[in-house]
Every structure is written in C-alpha cells, then in structure tokens.
UniProtKB/Swiss-Prot annotation:
The keyword Metal-binding applies. It comes from Varicella-zoster virus (strain Dumas) (HHV-3). This is Tripartite terminase subunit 1. Component of the molecular motor that translocates viral genomic DNA in empty capsid during DNA packaging. Forms a tripartite terminase complex together with TRM2 and TRM3 in the host cytoplasm. Once the complex reaches the host nucleus, it interacts with the capsid portal vertex. This portal forms a ring in which genomic DNA is translocated into the capsid. TRM1 carries an endonuclease activity that plays an important role for the cleavage of concatemeric viral DNA into unit length genomes. The gene is TRM1. HAMAP family: HSV_TRM1.
C-alpha cells in the first residue's frame, strides 16, 4: 500500500513539474502569442487549486511528523506553481488589455512585461533567518542553497538547546525559501548555488576515501559539491528544427511545407565548419609538394631536391599518423565557431518563423538582445546559448588556454615536432622556383634538409687546436641550453595540463546545466521531523490511561532528597564508562546524522563526529566534549536543584547553553545508571524523544526491567523542552500508548526515579504514587 502511494505521488509530482516547465516556457514567450493560451492557463490554475485543496489536510498532518521528501517536494511545487501560474495569468490579462486592445502599441510594453514576469528589479533569494535558543537569539542571512544547508547543520548541532516551537517557526521561513527554489522546478538559477561550498555528503565522502597524506580540511578547500545541485550533460542537436518541423500541429500544410523548403535552402547555402579553421598556408604547401612529386615516376629521373621533398613529406606524414591523439587536438572548437553556430541557429529560427507566421515574435532573449550583446566574454559564457551545449563551451575554453600557452615559438616547437619539417618543406619549395637553377637549388636544399633531419651526424671541423675546442664548447653550451629549454617547456606543458584537469571540474559544474539534488531536501525533512517528533510524542503520551505529573506533586521534594542522598554515596564502575559515554554521545547529538540507526550501525560517537565537524566546532570544545564523561570526580556530576533539571534561566550564549545541556544530560546518565545498580529495579532505558519505539541497534530482545517486562516503549525519554524535559513511560502495550499505560511528567531526575522505583517494586503500596 505504501509503495503504491509513493508511486502515485511521484507520478503526480512529475506532472506538476511538467506544468511548471510549461509555465516557464510561456513566461519567456512573446506575450502577444502567450495571450492565446489564457484559457488553458486558467484551467490549469483551477486544477492546481483543486489539488491543493484535496491534499491540504494530508499535507498539514504529515508535515507535523513523518514527512517524506516526496510529499515535501510535491507540497512546495504545488504552492509555487499556484502562485506563479496565477500571477502569470494576471500579467497576461493586463498586457492584453494594454497592448492587444489598443490602449498602447509601444514596443517597450513587451520589455516591461518581461521585467514584471521575472521580477528583474528585485531579488527574492535573500532572507534573514532568526532563531531563539536557550542561550539567546541568533540570526543568519541566506543567499545560496548552501547557506540553507549550513544553517540546518547548525540547527542540528543546537538541537538540544532549542525548543520545538522556536525551531518550527524558523523552519517556516526556510520553507518559504525552499518553495521559491526547489518548488520552482528542476533547474536552479546559476546565481543560487556556489559549488565551492562543500556539503555534509562531501565531507562524509572525503572521510572514507584515500587522503594521500593531505588533511581533511585541506581537501575540502578544493572540493566541488555535486549533491545540493547535480550537473547533467545536455546534448544540443542543431537539426531539431528540421526534424520536428513537419509534425508541428495547428499549422496549414502549405505553410509547413514552405518552411521546410526554406530551411533546406538555407542549409545548402550556409555551411558552418564545426571543426574550426585549419592551417590553410600549410595545406597549400603540402598540395604543391604532392603535385610536384606526382609529376615524377620510375621512368623519369628526378633531381636530388625531389628526394629531399619526398623525405620531408614522409616525416610529416608519419608524425601526423603515429601515436595517440594529443590533448590539443581534442579541443578543436573555439569561441568564434560557437558564435557562428549561434548566429546560424538564430537565422534558422527566423527563417522558419517568417515562413510559418509571416513575422518574428519578440521572445525574452530578443527583447533583451541589446543587454545580452553588451555582455563581456565571461558573462556570455555563463549565460550560454541555444545552439551549443555547455560542454562545447568548456572544450572551447580549454582549447583557448592551450592555444594561448602554445603561442610562443619555443612552445610551438615542443608541442609540434613537425613544425621544423613544415618550415623546411616550405623553404625548399621556394628555392625550387626557377627551373634553370633546379639542380643547384635542389642540391643545396637536400643538403640543408639532410642536416635538419639528422641531428646526430658528426661535424667535421677544419680548424684544430684551440679553435676546435672553443667551437665545441659553444656547441655543447647551445645543446645544453636547448635541452634545458625543452625540459622546461615540457614541465610547463605538464603543469598546464594538470591545472586544466583540476579546473575542468569547476568549469563543468559552473557551466553545465544543474538540477536540484536530494541532499538539501533530505536534510530539511530530517530536521523538521526531528523537532516535530517532540510535539507528536507529547500528544501521544497525553492519551495514556494514567498520568502522573510530579511537577505539581507536594511530596516530590522528599522523594528528590531521598534518591539524591542515596546515590551520592555511590560511584559508577569505571568499566561502565565507555558504554555510558556512548549513551551520552547519543543523547547530545541531533537528528540529522543518525549513523547509529543504520542497518550496519556505527557507534554514536561517529554520528556526533559528523555533527560537530560539519559546523566547524573549535578543537578545544571537541576535546572538552570527548572527555566530558571521563572528567567526573566523586559526586561532581550532580548539578540540578529540585525541579531545576534542564533549566537555562539566565544563560547567555550558545556555547554556555551547550555546556549546561551537556552537564544536565551527564547527570541524567549517571543518575539512571546508579539507580539501576543500587535499587535493582531493572535497567532503566534512556531514549531520545525523536526515536520513540525505535531500537537503535536493531535488537529484538529488550533489556530486563523497563522496556521488556512492561512494554516495548517503556523508558525515560528526554524531550529537550524546558517546560517538560523528562517523561517516563511504564506498562505500554504492544500497540503503543493505551489505557493501561502509566506516564510520568517531571522536571527533576531524582523525583522521577523515585516514582519509577515505587511503580517497579513488586510490593509497592505507596498511595502517593498510585
């Protein structure tokens, strides 16, 4: 049943996203054309209203607790498209009144419509978040999706010092931001995400991968996040128009056929070279050399210069075919070719529009063509175009980097070994221009080419002695200089390649089309469910058959003194400290990182590690937290006065509130442990309020005492609420809280333990706790 519901919700979510995409297309169309679809838009707006009314009660119920990413995404998408669809409908009606019905024919009216449709004068992504914790008021400004993710991680760290009412009010503001972003469809605006900020998933991935001697935080500096938003490869086919044109509906066949013929005529006249410009000079030289060589055969004697030309052609041919393709040869496109593609695509679109409609509509990109044309190269690349995929732009950028680096003569020689052979062939052909001096010129050219091709040939010096020594020294110095420059150039090429490989990941993330990932949605749902679980828990326990409220019991003070004075004379066994430390880590952690609840559960300290590391907690605070349970001497773990457990009155500052909360939770852990060992009433289970009915380690058997003999939900629950921090459940049924269940409210640890002792003792007859 649950699987069918999820499938239905996913299908509905897909349909809503399709409608959002259609609204976005309609908003970018010429408003004179979009006004024709007002009736269809109105029908869709009414359908969205019906869906919201149909699901509103279910949304409100599930948003309190047990929310899922699918339900959350569907709710946000419906709320967004309801507002945007109706706003677009009103704008089109207003435009139709002004422009179509003759009030004004100003062309600026179309641009004003686009400014209003896209809210170009205001930024809707800047929000101020405020949160009131037990340690005071904090605020944060959000601009990017990663700001929301960081705030949710900070809220997770402050889970134990924040009331559910304040947290849920803050999450309402976050919900409005998420509705305008994730609810707006699949593709986020470029200005909304910053991939240089790693998320929690990036941090976890780096923790389990090889570090190669680098620290984790140093690796985070070069991390490109692909979880909050995910990049996708987009293939742009320039032949989409001609392939889909014959199947366009609502167009007369004559106009459709004339558009197809006009488009084919345009394609035959316009040829765009996708491979870029080649070296035309060398192609002509190579063609002349081939023509001269083809004029000779085995029956016709050839001069020596022809053999030199043949050898140069041999080396050039062998050099161009052997070996793998170089990196430079892969990046053949350039920015000029991409611009030509864009112009050709625009010309194609205009041709089809004139053939079909007799005029060209003013869409969004044409209305702001002047603004788009004034952009510099970097902004133009970020904006992109319709005819080229982002990967083509990336390849063009990388090719431009290589071309700029290889523009020096030395780098051209290193990257292109056949450059010298090309120059020699060109010079040789120039020297063979005169037929009368062919033999002499061919001999000189062959001699020069043989010297160039055979670098290892021995050089005979006519002068011996000191002149020979000086000449050899000069040659050796020149050779060392050449080798050094070649080595230096190869190192620079290697460094350039490594730099481009490192920067390519960031280029791809920035320029490619991105879609919203599931990381931010899952984080929000986890935090909302974590705080909503408190309200749901208090609502469930209020339905118990027997409720004892020690917060108003007159005899609770005597019970407090009895249990406190009894436990203070005992100490915790040192062998139990590791287990108690893990319990402490489990209770001070937030709901976001729950590695101790996984199928292959990890210790609670692992989950707490991710909590504190993702908020950048100071090292001295992490050390203090790690040694918090081991720093107990005697009875210094006792902290709270009577009915003063989890009281933060007069505390200022988040850090001070956190320390006080740690002390309260440590007191609770030690008190329940000593109570179990002293009074032998069975093990008292300490549970988190957001894990009601969950066994974090997946055990089927419950411990003896609370949790086994009386019911699966029995235990002491820490609610993290100042008004009612402690709730104990006794005798819960198999189905949960029923009329036989006993629930105890308290704000004091020791009076609560006394009540449990009275209830769990087999001969309990004290009427004060009946």
């Amino acid at each position: 049943m649950e699987l069918d519901i999820n499938r239905t919700l996913l299908v509905l979510l897909g349909q809503v996203y399709t409608y959002i995409f259609q609204v976005e297309l309609l908003r970018r169309c010429d408003p004179r054309v979009a006004c024709r679809f007002l009736y269809r838009l109105a029908a869709n707006c009414l359908t969205v209203r019906y869906l919201l009314k149909l699901f509103l009660r279910g949304f409100n119920t599930q948003l309190k607790f047990g929310n899922t990413p699918t339900v959350c995404a569907l709710h946000w998408a419906l709320c967004y498209v309801k507002g945007e669809g109706e706003r677009l409908f009103e704008l089109l009606q207003h435009f139709k009144t002004r422009f179509v019905y003759g009030e004004t024919k100003d062309s600026n009216c179309i641009k004003d419509y686009f400014v209003s449709a896209f809210n170009l004068k205001t930024c809707q992504y800047h929000h101020e978040l405020s949160l009131t914790t037990y340690g005071g008021y904090v605020s944060s400004e959000i601009q990017f999706l990663h700001d929301i993710e960081n705030f949710l991680k900070q809220l997770n760290y402050c889970y134990i010092i924040t009331s559910s009412r304040e947290a849920l009010n803050t999450l309402e503001t976050v919900t409005r931001f998420m509705t305008d972003t994730i609810g707006s469809g699949l593709i986020p605006p470029v200005e909304l995400f910053d991939p240089a900020h790693p998320c929690a998933i990036c941090f976890e991935e780096l923790c389990i991968t090889a570090n190669q001697g680098e620290t984790l935080h140093r690796r985070l500096l070069g991390c490109i996040c692909d979880h909050v938003t995910k990049q996708v490869r987009v293939n742009v086919d320039v032949d989409d128009i001609i392939r889909c044109l014959p199947y366009i509906p609502d167009v007369p066949d004559i106009k459709r056929q004339s558009a197809v013929e006009a488009l084919r005529t345009l394609q035959t006249k316009t040829v765009v070279n996708p491979m870029g410009a080649k070296n035309d000079t060398f192609d002509q030289t190579y063609e002349i050399a081939s023509t001269m060589l083809d004029s000779y055969n085995v029956f016709k004697p050839a001069p020596r210069c022809m053999y030199a030309i043949s050898e140069l052609k041999f080396w050039l041919t062998s050099n161009s075919t052997e070996g793998p393709q170089r990196t430079l040869d892969v990046f053949v496109d350039n920015l000029d070719v991409l611009n030509e593609h864009e112009k050709h695509a625009e010309l194609t679109a205009v041709t089809v529009e004139l053939a079909l409609f007799g005029k060209t509509p003013i869409h969004f990109d044409r209305a702001f063509s002047e603004e788009l044309g004034s952009l510099d190269a970097i902004d133009s690349i970020l904006v992109g175009n319709r005819s080229s995929s982002p990967d083509s732009q990336i390849e063009a950028l990388i090719k431009a980097c290589y071309a700029h680096h290889l523009s020096s003569p030395l780098m051209r020689h290193i990257s292109n070994p056949s450059h010298d052979n090309e120059a020699a062939l060109r010079q040789l052909l120039e020297r063979v221009g005169c037929e009368d001096d062919l033999t002499k010129e061919a001999s000189d050219s062959a001699t020069a080419s043989e010297c160039d091709l055979n670098d290892d040939s021995s050089i005979t010096f006519a002068v011996h002695g000191w002149e020979n020594l000086l000449s050899k020294a000069k040659i050796d110095a020149a050779e060392r200089k050449r080798v050094y420059l070649e080595h230096l150039s190869k190192r620079s090429l290697t460094s350039l390649g490594r730099c481009i490989r490192e920067q390519r990941q960031e280029l791809e993330k920035t320029l490619r089309v991105n879609v919203y990932g599931e990381a931010l949605l899952q984080t929000f749902v986890s935090m909302q469910n974590g705080f909503g679980a408190r309200n749901v828990f208090l609502a469930k326990v209020s339905q118990a058959g027997c409720i004892i409220d020690n917060r108003i019991q007159e005899a609770a003070f005597d019970a407090h003194r009895f249990i406190r004075n009894t436990l203070v004379r005992h100490t915790v066994d040192a062998a139990m400290l590791p287990a108690l430390t893990h319990k402490f880590f489990e209770l001070v952690n937030g709901p976001l990182f729950n590695h101790d609840e996984h199928r292959f559960a990890q210790p609670p300290n692992t989950a707490l590690f991710f909590t504190v590391e993702n908020v950048g907690l100071f090292p001295h605070l992490k050390e203090e937290l790690a040694k918090f349970m081991g720093g107990v001497v005697g009875s210094n773990w006792l902290l709270s006065p009577f009915r003063g457990f989890y009281c933060f009155s007069g505390v200022e500052g988040v850090t001070f509130a956190q320390r006080l909360a740690w002390k309260y939770i440590r007191e609770l852990v030690f008190a329940t442990t000593l109570f179990t060992s002293v009074f032998h009433c069975g093990e008292v289970r300490l549970c988190r309020v957001d894990r009601l009915g969950k066994d974090p380690r997946g055990c089927t058997s419950q411990p003896k005492g609370i949790g086994s003999s009386h019911g699966p939900l029995d235990g002491i629950y820490l609610t993290y609420e100042e008004t009612c921090p402690l709730v104990a459940i006794i005798q819960s049924g198999e189905t949960g809280i029923d009329q036989n269940t006993v629930v105890i409210y308290d704000s004091d640890v020791f009076s609560l333990l006394y009540t449990l002792m009275q209830r769990l003792a087999p001969d309990s007859t004290d009427p004060a706790f009946s």
